[in-house]
Design a protein with these regions (language model features):
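Feature detects amphipathic, helix-rich regulatory segments
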Residues: 1-208
Length: 208
């Protein structure tokens, strides 16, 4: 999808503006080192291809569900609740992270989806579910943090493989990031970047 020069210039201006403001904002508050594995309870998916049913209730989150814009791609894959899938049904505010990439460039590896509703999605193999510790962290904030380029850069560096790369959760769960422990500040940061995302999406839609 092509974005016009005018829209591109506007978007770049917004990014520069927030990049300029954001450092002064974040360093005025308390940030702590936190390991990826400490933000919530993590569990890996299994192969559920045998359960695929075109008339199923649940949307399936698999490697093809992740996009470079961090939005869910509906591939039309469905399952029902069965003995095999029932433990992999996601809850609202869960995060899912893709641990594989179909290419060596790492366009989607480490990207995260924020689940927006209860009892609607099931996660497949190659995805790690993170049940956020909501006493400490806001899921919307972690969604923005984990999809940031500098966050994903660490994950890409930890990847293995050649034509198709992958990471092990056990390895990347030890990666440390600076995170504010103030939920009020988490909320403000999440809102800033959610607004930026919305503006970018709006400008892209205007190209059609």
């Amino acid at each position: 999808m092509m974005v016009s020069y005018a829209s591109s210039t506007t978007i770049q201006g917004l990014i520069r503006k927030f990049t300029y403001i954001f450092p002064f904002f974040i360093y005025s508050i308390s940030w702590e080192q936190c390991k990826l594995g400490d933000i919530g309870k993590a569990s890996g998916g299994i192969s559920i291809e045998s359960e695929f049913d075109e008339f199923g209730k649940y949307k399936v989150i698999s490697i093809g569900s992740y996009s470079v814009t961090n939005k869910y791609i509906d591939q039309g894959i469905r399952v029902n609740k069965t003995e095999k899938t029932e433990n992999y049904i996601l809850n609202k505010n869960d995060l899912t992270m893709i641990l594989n990439d179909k290419t060596a460039s790492g366009n989607i590896i480490g990207r995260v989806l924020l689940i927006d509703t209860d009892d609607s999605y099931v996660f497949n193999q190659r995805t790690e579910r993170i049940e956020v510790n909501e006493d400490e962290y806001l899921p919307e904030f972690l969604y923005q943090l984990l999809n940031a380029d500098n966050t994903r850069a660490k994950i890409i560096l930890a990847s293995q493989g050649n034509t198709q790369i992958y990471v092990n959760w056990r390895t990347i769960s030890k990666l440390a990031y600076k995170i504010t422990m103030s939920k009020d500040e988490q909320s403000k940061i999440a809102k800033i970047f959610t607004n930026v995302d919305n503006i970018i999406t709006l400008h892209q839609r205007k190209q059609f």
